[in-house]
C-alpha cells in the first residue's frame, strides 16, 4: 500500500466520497483533517506475513480496479498465496480463490461498477466449494 503516501486530500475533491462528506458532515470544512487522520490510520495497518495469507482456507474473491491504489502485481501475489493462478484445466479444476481486475476502475470508482460486481459476486457465492 505504498501508494498511500502519495495521496493528498485535494486528490479526493469532487469524488463521491468528498461530495457525500461535505453534504452530511457537521463541519464539512474539516475534510482535510479527516483525510489526514485516515491516512495516518492506514499507515498503521500491518502487513500480513505470506504464511498467514496462505493459511486462509476459505474461498476468497479479490477485486481491484486496474487503476487501483492496490497494484495489480500485489493482487496477483495475494491470489497466488490463496491458491490461485494455477492451471485450471486439469482434473483438480479451478481453485476456490478468484481474482477480478476491473478495467477502467479505481479503488473509489469500483462502487460505480455494480453491474459487474453483482454478477461476479453472485457467481462466486454460488460456486461449489472444492475440498482441499
Kindly give the residue locations of the regions a language model identified.
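Flexible "cap/lid" loop of the alpha/beta hydrolase fold
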Residues: 1-21
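Conserved alpha/beta-hydrolase "acid-adjacent" motif
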Residues: 69-77, 110
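Short, conserved loop/helix-junction motifs that constitute active-site signature segments
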Residues: 53-57, 92-94
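Active-site nucleophile elbow and catalytic-triad environment of alpha/beta-hydrolase enzymes
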Residues: 36-52
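Short glycine/proline- and acidic residue-enriched helix-loop micro-motifs
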Residues: 16-37
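Catalytic active-site module of serine/aspartate enzymes centered on a nucleophile-bearing elbow/loop
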Residues: 89-132
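Acidic beta-to-alpha connecting loop that harbors the catalytic carboxylate
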Residues: 66-69, 104-106
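Short beta-strand/loop motif that positions the catalytic acidic residue
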Residues: 56, 62-64
Amino acid at each position: 500500500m505504498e501508494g498511500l503516501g502519495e495521496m493528498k486530500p485535494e486528490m479526493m475533491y469532487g469524488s463521491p466520497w468528498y461530495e457525500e462528506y461535505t453534504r452530511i458532515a457537521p463541519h464539512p470544512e474539516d475534510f482535510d483533517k479527516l483525510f489526514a487522520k485516515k491516512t495516518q490510520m492506514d499507515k498503521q495497518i500491518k502487513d500480513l506475513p505470506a504464511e498467514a495469507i496462505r493459511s486462509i482456507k476459505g474461498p476468497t474473491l479479490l477485486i481491484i480496479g486496474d487503476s487501483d491504489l492496490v497494484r495489480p502485481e500485489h493482487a496477483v501475489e495475494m491470489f497466488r498465496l490463496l491458491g490461485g493462478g494455477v492451471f485450471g484445466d486439469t482434473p483438480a479444476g479451478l481453485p476456490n480463490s478468484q481474482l477480478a481486475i476491473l478495467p477502467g476502475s479505481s479503488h473509489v470508482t469500483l462502487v460505480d461498477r455494480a453491474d459487474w460486481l453483482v454478477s461476479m459476486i453472485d457467481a462466486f457465492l454460488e460456486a461449489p466449494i472444492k475440498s482441499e
